[in-house]
């Protein structure tokens, strides 16, 4: 090969695939703490009804940040709590979302190594599939999760709503750990347009998820061949318990110990303990 023989293999690859190195303008060590954001989200939320229902009250967004954090923050009646966008090594934890339910909670959007932990979402509003019923603790339509090419996100000890599910908003997020979380497991709440599928690439892992509803869809599929929407590469699910569900295991890498909790109770904490020799005190505080 002409390029390889001259030590120019990397140059060839960049030319062939369009790779390039760019500067990344960003801020470091930005912290948001001890504040409450209050919006006026409607009390009759309907997904994609109009701009006001979907996004009228987005009080804050963390964009192009590294080594930054949000903690001890409350959101009341917001359309969307916080998107962590085009960022790296950002944490958001000890957060409460209350009031009227809205569109989204907290997401890693096109970011790397984002930690979202101990978020409690108890917003109220009409059930998505039965708008005549007002559900206390229904939760944001999209619970905490990922969007765009997010990589290496951890969703840890989050307690989301009864009429919700984790977000996985397509455009190819990958390597997401949903660890020791509790809430509804409502299908088709992940989001994403059909031309942005799949919802998630490889390495989606659900560990010790505690479902607060029984899932009637039988079997529960991860790749819908009859629709342009709803497409996950085979996930790993370990210790799914609480409500009943029948997974199509042919669409999964692993479904282990369904109906039981497993040890370690938190995969993220176990990895921290192995890597650091101890677990930070944060994880000892239970929601």
Predicted region positions:
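A structural detector for beta-sheet-dominated domains
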Residues: 5, 22, 33, 38-40, ...
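Short alpha-helical segments and helix-capping/turn motifs at coil-helix boundaries
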Residues: 16-19, 55, 77-78, 162-163, ...
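Single conserved hydrophobic/aromatic residue that forms the stacking wall/gate
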Residues: 2-12, 285-286
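Right-handed parallel beta-helix
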Residues: 28-39, 66-77, 88-101, 110-141, ...
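Extracellular beta-strand-rich solenoid/capping regions of secreted or surface-exposed proteins
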Residues: 13-30, 49-65, 84
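Catalytic domains of carbohydrate-active enzymes that cleave complex glycans
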Residues: 156-163, 174-284
């Amino acid at each position: 090969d002409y390029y390889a023989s001259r030590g120019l293999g990397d140059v060839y690859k960049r030319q062939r695939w369009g790779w390039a190195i760019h500067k990344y303008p960003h801020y470091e060590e930005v912290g948001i703490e001890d504040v409450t954001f209050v919006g006026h989200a409607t009390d009759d939320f309907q997904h994609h009804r109009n701009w006001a229902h979907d996004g009228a009250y987005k009080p804050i967004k963390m964009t192009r940040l590294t080594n930054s954090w949000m903690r001890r923050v409350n959101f009341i009646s917001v359309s969307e709590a916080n998107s962590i966008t085009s960022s790296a090594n950002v944490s958001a934890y000890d957060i409460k979302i209350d009031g009227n339910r809205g569109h989204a909670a907290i997401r890693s959007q096109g970011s790397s190594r984002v930690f979202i932990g101990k978020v409690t979402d108890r917003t109220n509003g009409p059930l998505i599939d039965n708008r005549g019923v007002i559900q206390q603790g229904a939760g944001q339509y999209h619970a905490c999760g990922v969007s765009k090419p997010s990589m290496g996100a951890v969703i840890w000890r989050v307690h989301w709503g009864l009429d919700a599910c984790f977000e996985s908003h397509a455009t190819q997020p990958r390597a997401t750990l949903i660890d020791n979380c509790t809430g509804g497991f409502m299908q088709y709440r992940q989001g994403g347009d059909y031309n942005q599928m799949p919802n998630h690439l490889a390495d989606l892992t659900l560990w010790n998820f505690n479902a607060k509803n029984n899932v009637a869809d039988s079997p529960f599929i991860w790749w819908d061949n009859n629709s342009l929407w709803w497409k996950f590469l085979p996930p790993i699910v370990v210790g799914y318990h609480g409500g009943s569900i029948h997974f199509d295991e042919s669409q999964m890498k692993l479904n282990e110990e369904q109906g039981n909790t497993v040890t370690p109770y938190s995969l993220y904490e176990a990895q921290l303990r192995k890597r650091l020799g101890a677990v930070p005190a944060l994880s000892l505080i239970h929601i």
